[in-house]
UniProtKB/Swiss-Prot annotation:
This is Phosphate transporter PHO1 homolog 6. Residues 377-396, 462-477, 653-676 are extracellular. It is found in: Cell membrane. CDD domains: SPX_PHO1_like. The lineage of its organism: Eukaryota, Viridiplantae, Streptophyta, Embryophyta, Tracheophyta. One of its GO terms (molecular function) is inositol hexakisphosphate binding. Induction: Not induced by Pi deficiency. It comes from Arabidopsis thaliana.
Length: 756
């Protein structure tokens, strides 16, 4: 039974330990076979004859205590091998009580959450009613003064009711009452489909002003992502605002409640699956036991399971049905297909054309690299004079795409291995269900960028050597700029193409990182900032793009950027910004979480900022005496940074180097079964960390061009980051498993004052 492949990885410790129970059954079977080999056939055959003749005796006796703990008494301990079976039933009881207790606790949690969502729905419906009433009165008043045309009035039947009441000389109350009754015709079965029979809507039906009483006791919670609300949270100012009845507010409220319903439905689905899989596991293991021992214990034990909360509770199913009915009615206008697609998105199908396209682009990249090497060799393009000029100008432009492609390849490898070892990366990053990219999609994007960049390089070299296009040198120099602009356009295009949800998620996270510490720091925010820390050379290349094309150097293929004081100043800022952004994020987390460890982490990034700035000072300063000082100080601070960062990587980010662990110098829980992988990863991390010091110390190699050394070191840092990514998320996943954290917290739109 492939039991482990179906359960939620965050709850894996709460499931029946089927594997261990199976080993106990094998022990019983091994003893039975050993007994049979030594003359135990007679007793076994007599047992079989008794069963065939209908003479059966009870094997087990099940009971439950006042503390809702189930116990099994094994009645055949006097038989040979009875002690093995006794151990089996004791462990079976422990496993069953564990899952039953966990399930009962989770059911209690979802019932409480259902009550909270119930109150939120009351407030939403009251909000809608209030808006409808205000809109009706407003339209009726405008119609009375001739502002609204008869055609517009005819479109809204409820407005017509109000007009008739007003024209008869009566008050608008009749119209309001009629409109309210029409609304409740649609909402009259709200109590039947939602969570609790005692619903505040019944009070609303008894009085036209009852819903106002609900609205009087609530306020709107500010949107979680809003800059203002996050600033207020740091300043300890209330994040609750008075109700404003506008369509924009209604839209935001509905969006939040939709997210809450989706997450709540997902939790119910997990619980339903949890109950089914555990009952199935218990049934399977007891069937195996009965088959080996020729007893009939499964029937008695499964009766106890069926009577327990795990086997008999129908609260989850009822809640799920009610949630689905309410969601479909309130948010999709009764369209069940649309509603269920939102609540339970269908998994994406693997498309063969994606596999083919990814492989095709990978083959194209390999062919283009071979062609590039052949062209450079045969045409002798990069001669002594041209090589220096090309390496100082065109190489930094094109290496940008190489760094991006390499990083995406490493990320694709991360996704592949996360899936292999069941790391729930989509939950950790907070991706919307069904929108996360797979490793093939990431490879497709990365290979597309790589293939286009190589095509541009070949086109550039070919246009330079071709007499017909040699006069268009300025145009050939613009090819990398055109590609960079095309990438930027694809990244920000608002249309639903090119993985829009992933692009929007990336841009939102990037904005949060740039605006640190004004936004609450989440894992995607600091994870992206860490990626940019390893892409410092890419950021410098972008600055070089602005200088090279903005100041017109591309027309003569000259690099005069480093002669500019402005360029050198921004070089400091660009190089240090990712690390400084991480420092600000650490400070924000330290203030919010009251965690001093975040302060130490922030100090680590400040040391890196100092080391990077000293390295930049050594690079741009022409005075040899000062260069020696900059290099010495840079070497000291970079060595401090490397030691500090290496320790933090291994101990805090990866959770390794635990002396008291059952896996010496690693950690208790390891997803990869081969421990040597962790040792190798630690060694590689240390070596590549020290290789990073080359960016600060800038050692010269006579046989290798400086730009080549820079590109190699930057690539090694990207590879190190890719390795770091896997173990960082593995550790985060194991923390979630230890805390049974399988669902994200969702902010609700309404805040009931009486609750606080």
């Amino acid at each position: 039974m492939k039991f482990g492949k179906d359960f939620s990885s965050e709850w894996q410790q709460a499931y029946v330990d089927y594997k261990y129970l199976k080993t106990l059954v094998k022990d019983i079977n091994r003893f039975k076979r050993k007994t049979n080999l030594h003359g135990g056939q007679i007793s076994l055959s007599s047992t079989v004859l008794e069963i065939e003749d209908g003479i059966t005796t009870a094997t087990i006796q099940v009971s439950s205590t006042a503390s809702q703990r189930y116990e099994t008494t094994f009645l055949m301990t006097a038989e040979k091998g009875g002690e093995y079976e006794l151990v089996f039933f004791r462990r079976l009881d422990d496993e069953f009580n564990k899952v039953e207790k966990f399930y009962r606790e989770k059911v209690d949690e979802v019932v409480k959450e259902a009550a909270v969502l119930n109150k939120q729905m009351d407030a939403l419906i009251a909000f809608r009613l209030k808006m409808k009433e205000e809109s009706t009165v407003e339209m009726a008043r405008f119609a009375l003064h001739g502002v609204v045309s008869p055609a517009e009035l005819a479109k809204n039947p409820s407005m017509k009711v109000h007009m008739e009441a007003i024209e008869e000389g009566g008050s608008s109350r009749a119209g309001r009452r009629s409109d309210e009754d029409d609304y409740y015709t649609d909402e009259e079965d709200h109590n039947d489909v939602f969570f609790t029979p005692a619903n505040n809507l019944s009070k609303m039906k008894s009085s036209s002003s009852a819903f106002i009483e609900v609205l009087d006791s609530i306020k709107i919670n500010n949107t979680k992502e809003a800059l203002q609300s996050n600033t207020k949270s740091v300043l300890k100012v209330s994040n609750h605002t008075e109700l404003k009845f506008s369509r924009d507010n209604l839209r935001k409220i509905e969006e939040k409640l939709i997210c809450a319903f989706v997450e709540f439905h997902r939790k119910l689905w997990y619980l339903k699956s949890y109950s089914f899989l555990n009952v199935l596991a218990l049934s399977k293991i007891l069937t195996k036991y009965d088959k080996i021992t020729s007893r009939d214990a499964a029937k008695s034990y499964m009766k106890m399971v069926d009577k327990s909360c795990l086997g008999s509770s129908d609260e989850v199913m009822k809640l799920m049905e009610n949630v689905e009915a309410t969601f479909i009615k309130q948010f999709t206008n009764g369209n069940r297909t649309k509603g269920m697609n939102i609540l339970r998105p269908k998994p994406k199908r693997e498309r063969h054309r994606l596999t083919f396209s990814t492989g095709f682009l990978g083959g194209c990249m390999f062919s283009l690299i071979v062609a590039l090497v052949a062209i450079v060799r045969t045409r002798n393009i990069l001669q002594d004079d041209g090589q220096k000029q090309y390496m100082n100008t065109m190489f930094p432009l094109y290496s940008l795409f190489g760094f991006i492609m390499l990083h995406m390849t490493m990320y694709a490898a991360n996704i592949y291995f996360w899936r292999q070892y069941r790391v729930n990366y989509s939950f950790i990053f907070g991706f919307k269900q069904g929108t996360e990219l797979g490793y093939k999609q990431v490879l497709f994007v990365g290979f597309s960028i790589g293939a286009l960049a190589l095509l541009c390089v070949l086109a550039n070299l070919d246009m330079e050597t071709d007499p017909k296009t040699k006069d268009y040198q300025a145009l050939t120099e613009l090819l990398p700029l055109f590609l960079l602009i095309a990438m930027f356009v694809v990244l920000v295009v608002p249309f639903n193409i090119f993985y829009r949800s992933s692009r929007f998620f990336f841009l939102t996270t990037l904005f949060h990182m740039l605006a640190a510490p004004l936004y609450k720091v989440t894992l995607p925010d600091f994870f992206l900032a860490d990626q940019l820390c390893s892409q410092a050379q890419t950021l410098r290349s972008i600055e070089f793009y602005i200088c090279y094309y903005g100041w017109g150097d591309f027309k003569q293929r000259k690099n005069t950027c480093k002669d500019s004081q402005v360029f050198n100043t921004f070089l400091f800022i660009v190089s240090a910004f990712p690390f400084f952004s991480r420092f600000l994020q650490c400070m924000r987390r330290m203030l919010e979480e009251k965690n001093i460890e975040q302060g130490y982490n922030g100090f680590k990034y400040i040391v890196i900022v100092v080391a990077v700035c000293l390295g930049m000072a050594y690079e741009v300063d022409d005075e040899k005496d000062r260069q020696i000082i900059w290099r010495l100080l840079g070497g000291i601070t970079s060595a401090m940074a490397v030691v500090f960062c290496t320790y933090w990587d291994l101990v805090y980010d990866w959770g390794l180097l635990n002396r008291t662990s059952k896996n010496p110098w690693l950690r208790d829980n390891l997803l990869i079964p081969h421990k040597e992988v962790y040792v190798l990863a630690m060694i590689l991390n240390v070596v590549l960390r020290f290789a990073w010091m080359q960016t600060v110390l800038d050692f010269k190699f006579e046989s290798i061009h400086t730009q080549t050394v820079v590109a190699v070191v930057a690539s090694l840092e990207i590879i190190r980051r890719g390795i770091w990514n896997f173990f960082r998320l593995e550790n985060e996943h194991l923390n979630n498993v230890g805390k049974y954290r399988a669902f994200k917290a969702v902010s609700l739109p309404f805040n009931y004052e009486v609750d606080h």
